[in-house]
Each structure stands twice: as structure tokens, then as C-alpha cells.
């Protein structure tokens, strides 16, 4: 919703054009990012946004779709490029949580058709981890482990293997359930 409102506003739409974004003063980019809450941490996330814009301009003349084309629209190849081969060029986006969810959102809400979409893991943010624990898929001891995100990914992959569901499909439901205090639906 925040991204859509930002895109529909002629004054803030420029943030989705990496070349145009890099031409603007820092304060203008920051203002556009926070206007509809695309960025919640104004300094840190503005820096990250600008770094991602620099990377996209440097590698693909500002068109991220060229990455998808180079990787044959294969989520595994795209993740390897972002998370392993070029991690430093993709701050935040190269993380386990965001990279999977970003690719999922692009798949769900655009006309992009990725290959191997079923390989996207659940994005193990705080809320997903809490929900995974609440459901008994990770123990109290595992909840405090430094490996809890990896464990959450593994447990959901195991549980959903051989079903019609992809692990990333459950992200939003788990996130909302935890975010709303695990309220009952009845």
C-alpha cells in the first residue's frame, strides 16, 4: 500500500526510477521515501535505497528487469547473484528475509513469472519466528538460538514439502497473526 501510494503520487514516483533518484538531492529522496512510509528509518533506509539505486544504474542502467533476464527469471540464480556473488552491492535486499519476500511480492503483484518460485523460503522475520514457535515448530530453547531463522526456514520447508503450498505463501498469514497478538478468529 505504501509503495502504491508513493508510485501514484507524481511528486514521489521518481524513487522507483534509479537514474532519476540519483539525480535528486538526498533530502528530496528521503522526503519521498518517508511520505507514505516506504521508509520507516529515514536515514538508514534512505542510504540503503540510494546504494541500491547506484547498483542498479551501474549494473543494468537502472533497469532491475535486466537482472531477471540475465538469470533466466530463475529465483535461485537471482538469489545467488544478490545474496552470494554481490552481497555488498545489495544492502538489506541481500538478507534472507527480504530477498525471498521481495521476489515473492514481485511475483504476486506484477506480471513477472519467475521460475522455481516454490524454492522461495518463508521470510523469517520476528513475527514469522514467533508464529512458528507458537505453532510448536520450534522449541523454547530454539527460539533463543542464533540459528532460529534458519530453523524456521527448515521447519516450514519440511512441513510443506509435497503439498500444494510454497513456504513463502504462509509468510503474510504468520506475520499478521503475530503482529495482531495471536488473536483468535472466533
Question: Over which residues does each language-model region extend?
Answer:
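HhH-family (HhH-GPD) DNA N-glycosylase catalytic core used in base-excision repair
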Residues: 1-186
Amino acid at each position: 500500500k505504501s509503495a502504491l501510494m508513493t508510485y501514484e503520487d507524481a511528486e514521489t514516483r521518481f524513487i522507483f526510477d534509479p537514474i532519476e533518484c540519483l539525480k535528486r538531492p538526498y533530502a528530496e529522496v528521503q522526503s519521498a521515501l518517508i511520505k507514505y512510509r516506504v521508509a520507516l528509518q529515514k536515514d538508514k533506509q534512505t542510504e540503503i535505497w540510494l546504494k541500491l539505486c547506484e547498483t542498479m544504474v551501474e549494473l543494468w542502467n537502472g533497469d532491475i528487469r535486466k537482472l531477471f533476464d540475465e538469470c533466466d527469471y530463475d529465483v535461485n540464480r537471482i538469489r545467488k547473484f544478490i545474496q552470494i556473488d554481490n552481497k555488498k552491492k545489495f544492502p538489506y535486499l541481500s538478507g534472507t528475509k527480504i530477498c525471498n519476500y521481495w521476489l515473492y511480492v514481485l511475483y504476486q503483484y506484477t506480471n513477472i513469472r519467475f521460475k522455481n518460485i516454490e524454492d522461495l523460503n518463508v521470510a523469517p522475520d520476528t513475527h514469522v519466528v514467533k508464529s512458528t514457535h507458537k505453532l510448536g515448530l520450534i522449541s523454547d530453547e530454539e527460539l533463543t538460538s542464533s540459528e532460529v531463522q534458519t530453523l524456521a526456514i527448515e521447519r516450514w520447508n519440511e512441513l510443506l514439502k509435497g503439498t500444494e503450498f510454497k513456504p513463502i505463501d504462509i509468510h503474510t498469514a504468520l506475520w499478521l497473526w503475530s503482529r495482531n497478538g495471536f488473536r483468535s478468529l472466533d
